[in-house]
Design a protein with these regions (language model features):
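Conserved Radical SAM active-site core
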Residues: 1-119, 123, 132-134
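Hydrophobic faces of well-ordered beta-strands that scaffold small-molecule active sites
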Residues: 25, 74, 101-103, 124-126, ...
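Conserved non-cysteine loop/helix-boundary elements of the Radical SAM core domain that shape
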Residues: 44-58, 77-88, 93, 109-110, ...
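Alpha-helical scaffold elements within enzyme catalytic domains, especially in hydrolases
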Residues: 65, 92, 116, 155, ...
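Active-site-proximal loop/turn and secondary-structure-junction residues that shape catalytic pockets
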Residues: 80-82, 107-109, 130-132, 180, ...
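Short low-complexity, flexible loop/linker segments enriched in glycine and/or proline
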Residues: 90-91, 117-118, 140-142, 259-265
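Non-cysteine beta-strand/loop elements that form the S-adenosyl-L-methionine
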Residues: 118-135, 201-210
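Auxiliary Fe-S-binding modules of radical SAM enzymes
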Residues: 161-275
């Protein structure tokens, strides 16, 4: 099986319990099951054929190279369309390493897909983007987003019901992310309501990093960053509901926190591995 990969490096911009002091060993896969008009990684998400072609053995060696550099974990970004071959790679990696595996996903995937990885994924890091089918259709071309994502997140919690954090670094568990969008705070509150109905309230990461990318510069709803008031409306509601988790400084809403997908960096890493 061939994977399409755009980046494989230590990443310091995840939640503190994921990035820690040394970085998260992050692998960005190309392609995506959604079509978010505001995607900040749109240059790799729009096509599964972008990036470099990587074999299963090469992917395994990339994992080991990140471990050797001190990564706190292996962080798989948008991996759902590779679940079956990933299972084979992860089974081999787990035999040789105790490093936690992070599954970083938009949550628009099947429960069956996730069950393939039961016992192989240590930390689930899903988004819950919307409850509103109108917003998910208008912004991501997926009217059934919540209908698929919510059961998927319940399955993630079934697999990893306890959050285990050692020396400030998560070893097992679930963190649900939510990106606050401009003019959409009521739906953000509905997202939190839905998460509060789970068997156990998950840790939540309420993100303020939205900024309009080129495709939505003139969008009637998405053409600006969120305001302090919008963000506080959501974080205050999370506090009322009793959530624990993570917030962001609004200064994070900048392209400076978007990773570089310069393929020469990945080519250089592959060359070092082979040498």
């Amino acid at each position: 099986m061939i994977f399409k990969v755009a980046r494989c490096e230590l990443h310091s911009w995840e939640e503190p319990v994921i990035s820690g002091t040394k970085g998260s060993g992050t692998v960005f896969f190309c392609g995506c099951s959604m079509r978010c008009v505001f995607c900040q990684n749109y240059n790799i998400s729009r096509s599964a054929n972008s990036g470099l072609s990587i074999t299963e053995d090469e992917l395994l060696q990339l994992f080991f190279s990140l471990e050797q550099e001190g990564a706190h974990n292996i962080n798989l970004v948008t991996p759902s369309h590779y679940a079956k071959p990933l299972k084979r790679v992860l089974e081999k990696f787990k035999k040789a390493s105790t490093l936690p595996i992070v599954y970083n996903t938009n949550a628009y995937e099947s429960v069956e897909n996730l069950k393939l990885l039961d016992g192989l994924v240590d930390i689930y890091l899903p988004d819950l983007k919307y409850v509103s089918s109108k917003l998910s259709l208008d912004f991501s071309a997926r009217a059934d987003y919540f209908e698929k994502a919510y059961p998927a997140i319940l399955e993630m919690q079934r697999q990893q019901p306890r959050n285990i954090i050692e020396n400030g670094i998560m070893q097992k568990g679930l963190i649900v992310r939510h990106l606050v969008l401009p003019n959409c705070t009521e739906d953000s509150k509905e997202v939190l309501d839905a998460l509060s109905r789970m068997p156990k309230k998950p840790l939540v990461s309420i993100m303020s990093q939205y900024f309009p990318t080129e495709p939505v510069m003139n969008h009637p709803v998405l053409n600006r960053k969120i305001s302090i008031r919008e963000y506080e409306k959501v974080t205050d509601y999370a506090s009322v509901l009793g959530f624990d988790g993570f917030t962001q400084d609004l200064k994070s809403a900048t392209v400076a926190y978007t990773p570089s997908f310069d393929l020469s960096i990945l080519k250089s890493r592959l060359k070092r591995i082979k040498d």
